[in-house]
């Protein structure tokens, strides 16, 4: 899982460096010297609901929907609230379990595996938000002097990650933490499409 978190955060950082102009249609991700172009789909107007994996979540009115992309098989959605940035991703989990299925020992090993990347976990707590259990993780990247708030859950073998952060050494405000919580609290199963 450290690979998924690292890829997600690296993709988000590269996404920001690309300029984020409204006319820009592609994002370039630099990963170990390999350049990859990711097409970002941009709708004409902001949707009320976003779907990712088998789930969907509601967008608050005070945010900007930047678009979505697929980064190394990970569905990814980008949102902004002023200088605060949120990246939502969905990845398949190699084992058919949910977060609630893990016993304490397995959960500790899992959390340990998340902290093995360049982003070190500064804090972790379990939380139930809406209907679903989450790990609320706090990451710190010393090189970027940036803190990340991460809501992370596994539902039916699918990992859902909500990452919220600000660039540089600006602390994440209480309002921004509430914004991320609001997004997570609206997540629910997407209705199945009728097969005609």
Where are these regions (language model features)?
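Signature of long, low-cysteine stretches enriched in small and polar/charged residues
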Residues: 108-156
